[in-house]
């Protein structure tokens, strides 16, 4: 493991990185929120279907 090389790589990445604008951050937050809501909705649908299937017990 070459520590000086790794540190220079990290510094180079940090110099290239920039903070997103408010519009970009807002768009990313909306997309991430929609993804989380979609996964939750999918889980709820599976739970609801398994509740009505005979012989299955919801946890």
Swiss-Prot record:
Any idea which UniProt keywords this protein has?
Cell membrane, Membrane, Protein transport, Translocation, Transmembrane, Transmembrane helix, Transport
**Presence of the UniProt keyword Lipid biosynthesis in the record:** no
Any single biological process term in GO: protein targeting
Q: What is its main location?
A: membrane
- Which Gene Ontology cellular component terms are annotated? plasma membrane
**Spans traversing the lipid bilayer:** 33-53
Entry's localization field: Cell membrane
Membrane topology recorded in Swiss-Prot or TrEMBL: Single-pass membrane protein
Under the heading SUPFAM superfamilies, the entry gives:
Preprotein translocase SecE subunit
Q: Which GO terms describe its molecular function?
A: protein transmembrane transporter activity
- Entry coiled-coil feature ranges: none
Task: Give the highest taxon in the source lineage.
Answer: Archaea
Quaternary structure and interacting proteins, as annotated? Component of the Sec protein translocase complex. Heterotrimer consisting of SecY (alpha), SecG (beta) and SecE (gamma) subunits. The heterotrimers can form oligomers, although 1 heterotrimer is thought to be able to translocate proteins. Interacts with the ribosome. May interact with SecDF, and other proteins may be involved.
**Family label:** Belongs to the SecE/SEC61-gamma family.
Stored NCBIfam families: PRK09400.1-6 (NF006910), secE_euk_arch (TIGR00327)
Q: Which HAMAP family match?
A: SecE
Annotated function: Essential subunit of the Sec protein translocation channel SecYEG. Clamps together the 2 halves of SecY. May contact the channel plug during translocation.
Put simply, this protein is called Protein translocase subunit SecE
Which organism's genome codes for this protein? Haloarcula marismortui (strain ATCC 43049 / DSM 3752 / JCM 8966 / VKM B-1809)
Q: Which gene encodes it?
A: secE
